[in-house]
Amino acid sequence: LNPYKPVAEIRDEIWKKYFPETFSGKTKTDAAHEALAKSQEAQKALGAALNVQAKDSTEAQANFEAARAKIMADTSLGTEDQQKIIDHVRSRCYTTHGTRSEDRTADKVSSEEGSVLVRDNATYSLAVATHGTHDFVVAGRIDRLEISPEGAKTLVEIKNRTRGLFKCVRDYENVQIQVYLHMLGLGRAKLIEQYNQKTNTIEITRDEELWDNVIWPGLLKFSKDLHAKATRGPQSEPCASDAE
């Protein structure tokens, strides 16, 4: 459901991390690092971009575009390597900016709405399946919890937008939130999207139909497929080329 991160890409990353003895392909990150190793200028562009603490989304966008221009101007790199590096720089820049912006967004919403948003540093997990001797779980950390005066908890997910407010929840964001709701045993969530000084809050409820018919079967299938591939022996060719 996430157009920006295909299933094969996620599978490769998990495969390499937890079953390195059978993984002989290359993850997208591996390919980007190989391309970066060919160019000192590209490495400098990435380092400089990550050191910029953008004050808002517009500045973060300008920072990435400046790095992109430097990479595109590097004639020592082929077009394919340039694109691998640009994708990597984009991901690193926007992820870093989103993490840095999270506190400001939470403080702004708390002040404007009079709500209590509590940071939760715990790592939550949800058991999915056991295949052979391997247990498969989904684990993650949430952004905030909103605590009402009566003590009721609402999950809060904060998203930094780079080009404007969506005013809606993307399917892949809803899947993430539904998984967190099941991990924590909660029924309600809020997605707070932020772009520069603007914020928008979208309320989301636990969707059991989506969970039963789409998300849970998808998790079971993913775990089964990953186990089958990771335990059959070394790859004969890069996993990323497998059809999904």
What are these regions (language model features)?
Residues 1-244:
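Accessory terminal regions of nucleic-acid processing enzymes
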